[in-house]
Amino acid sequence: MVEHYHSTYYYEIAINIPLNKLFFYKFNLNLEIGIRVMVNFNGSNKIGIIIKKYFENEFKEKFEFKIKEIIKIIDTTKIITEHNIDLAHWISKKTFSGFGETLFFGLPQNSKAKKNQTLPSINEHPDHKKCLELNNEQQNIYKEIIGSEKTNVFYLFGIPGSGKTEIFIKLCEYYLALEQQVLFLIPEISLGYQIIKRIKYALNMHHKIYEYNSKVPNSDKNLIWNKVKNGESLVVIGIKSVLMLPFTKLKLIIMDEEHETTYKSENIPRFHSRHISFFLQKKFNAKFVMGSATPSLEAYHAMKNNQIKKIIMQNKFSQSKIEDIKIINMKKEPSTISSELLYSIQKSLNEKRQSLIFINKRGYLKNLECNECGHIICCPNCSFGLIYHKKENKLLCHYCSYKTKTASHCPQCESKDIKYKTYGIQLVEKELKKFLPNAKIARIDSDITKIENIDSINKFENKEIDILIGTQIIAKGFNFENIKTLGIINADIGMGLPDFRSGERIFTTLSQIMGRAARFKDDNIIIIQTKNPNYYAIKYAYKNQYEQFYEEELDIRKKLNYPPFNKIIRIIFRSKNEESAKQKCWEFFEKSKEFLQEEIEHLGPSEAIMKKISKNYRYNIIYLSKSYSLLEKLVNKTKEKVKMTSTVYIEIDYYPISLI
């Protein structure tokens, strides 16, 4: 709202830049806090948001610098609320990001909806409602959550297929009936289709269920943003940007598949969705319900310490079971696909049943390695081996997308004795087509377009495909009713990585993908292929021993002082000049010694495990402490003493998911 008074008003404005400060501008109209304006910043026009307002008579002394005029008013009413400002302050402080860039994160761009525009809500079968029936266990859990007065944070800890989603949907129905707002977090955009499809058939409220993510048109995002800001009752489904909506009546937060690493933003601001959800839960006194068959170790530890109410779901919603689980030691197998797995797939085909093959790698084969000198052909921009992709007949870097022709000889010793080591999804596809020429086979991974992936998934659901091969995407949220055989290839991928979460990742991935085969039928067969059958994460996943894995992993982390027993901050220095990155990393460390205390441990300075990515050399320091405030003080105080240059970029990650 703009009030027309003839006077001069001063405004502190947030601009989308990586600085944690506001900037003074003036205007001759009384503008509302929270609206967007156009300003001149360092010679270029930028959009800013008014955060504070001052009257001319509030300043007794004149400014020592010239204050520029606001160029243009963009909004007639505020686009953000006090809640958005509070949240941005909290995130920027916690993640060491600029206040302005944090405030703008998730905000729809300035665009206007078309006249009479309607939102793309779920409207395929608007008159159809499938009655959502809960079993006794689900009904008791549902009543416990909505009836609890003292406890507001819950975790549904149940094996895949135990019926967590049905409880989530029932909770959505309850809070919509109370005219409240619901935030439904999912780990990937691709899962939105599955979740929405299930809600659609359970509730006749298609006009109250929306997606909010980077794929949604900007005009639609503006409409959803305003609906939330105006207090309309709805369910909004999204990943990270959805957390920034201007909620006013938020009473339920759902976090499906809480363990997924995609909830952590790897771009500025580098927050974790779980941490912001806790902030929102306290702010709105909402219920926060997480769920997973494989909780993150941090969540499990919090449940163990009674910081989160653990609700164990004992029963499987579909009452299915796994008939047989086998581990195949691939050291004794000559082929990519073991004879045991091939036999099981053929048997499934004979019974008109389907097979799901999971492989933890993209690409056709992995590294191109010289048998003479052992040299691995790497990306010239990154310290990472190039991977062969058959469709393009090229070597591709999965970090910076560098492409080159396949090599005929070793660039190190000129030997022609070079071979591809290990294998990927495209080779598995080729092998299956060779052994089973009459089977209908498809694969889904991130090398294929989204439309092609969705088409393959739909065909598999409709039993038009016999064998579906996939990478990580098939471990996340899909329910296939006609599976007989599940094959897991390369179960131990990641085992040798120098990363404290590698064991947890392997256990989680195996447990989740095994759950895909155990939902509907009661004669499923799972075959796990590995060269390390005794590795603890594989062993516990194979035996379905969840609690035992978590206890052993906690013991390992405690001995190493890693999370959840310590807070961790990783600082990466990257530059196209290796010496510059190295020097700045060491300079930061030397300056930080002034603030190092006994309670703070450090690793480094050292080269990052992935030393070079996209032509940038990387050096890092890792700080650990039980007290986050000590780490926060150390980083902020050291930053003040270190002069940064345009040739070295610093990344501060307050909660690193990976140390690679």
Swiss-Prot record:
A Gene Ontology biological process term: DNA replication initiation
Spans traversing the lipid bilayer: none
Protein name according to UniProt: Replication restart protein PriA
Coiled coil: none
Annotated positions binding Zn(2+) 1: 370, 373, 410, 413
Organism ancestry: Bacteria, Pseudomonadati, Spirochaetota, Spirochaetia, Spirochaetales
Domain Helicase ATP-binding: 145-313
Job description of the protein: Initiates the restart of stalled replication forks, which reloads the replicative helicase on sites other than the origin of replication. Recognizes and binds to abandoned replication forks and remodels them to uncover a helicase loading site. Promotes assembly of the primosome at these replication forks.
Helicase C-terminal domain boundaries: 405-557
